[in-house]
């Protein structure tokens, strides 16, 4: 029997984990400073949650979900994104009855059946935020600037915010109709999936990956030309706040994002460092999603950030050095010194990593272990310890010195 992994998944080995911790720690710190609380939702949910929220005509629902039946025949799906689960939790737990504004963040694995490529996997990890209960344009700006702050804290460069407005339920129908009329002229050029989208949700055609219709999309009607006064005022204020904060942005009239629930502001944060797949963060406003699930009228918005792609960027730009505490290897030359070795290890572990050798192995073997572990220092636990003295060897330079146990805390 050969043991392998399904395509599109990976092991995250110990050498890689410091990059994950770096991102998680920076993000958690910033989330909490912006008054977000962590939420953890199930990895699988009822399929209908995603069909209804993410959208029947999206690539995610039509082609990419991992859906299965449980032993009672219920349709379940591994979560392809984080927002629907957060909204379900908001409604099931009646958060809206106690908190007029709810700000949460999540970190965890998502699952989509798509073609694996650089920085993109079928099991991937996202961190994201959701804000429920605020419709003012300032919070759009704050959410975008929070995402930028995370990326800048990770020393990423060449960042640009791409932003658009998709309008609201009042002005969207006119835009949809114009889009439908435009693409109807080219119906025969559309794939069967895009022909279905033409009838059910023509906005999804703008998100199509079919290369044949890229030229058609260039001349398609733009949502900004159909905004009502309220949506235009909202969008103008978001842009003004970004400009006042000196954040680099450009208006992208064709940006619609790959989810059906977005309204008004949608955005991506891109970088030129990752080739074709250059969007690192994506998000937007979803003022009708809670109502879609039968809840009260509740404005909302959020973003999600792909961690695998972010780690790839961090490595490419090589601006951050991951440093571990020094590793001390305690080579025990006699079993009677184990108790002392444990006492010494407790002192050293206040600031350092410690590996304790085995007195049942020759000193030469223990030193080989120390070398294989890439130890920084070796402390020899031998008869000198009876005088409270230790011999320490710098395993990188070969330099040796003696130190009293009482001075270990100074290391």
Swiss-Prot record:
Class of this enzyme: ligase
Membrane-crossing residue ranges in chain numbering: none
Matching SUPFAM superfamilies: Class II aaRS ABD-related (SSF52954), Class II aaRS and biotin synthetases (SSF55681)
Ion transport listed as a keyword: no
EC number: 6.1.1.21
Swiss-Prot/TrEMBL GO biological process terms: histidyl-tRNA aminoacylation
Annotated GO CC locations: cytoplasm
Self-association state and partner proteins as the record states: Homodimer.
Family, per entry: Belongs to the class-II aminoacyl-tRNA synthetase family.
Official protein name in the record: Histidine--tRNA ligase
Organism of provenance: Dictyoglomus turgidum (strain DSM 6724 / Z-1310)
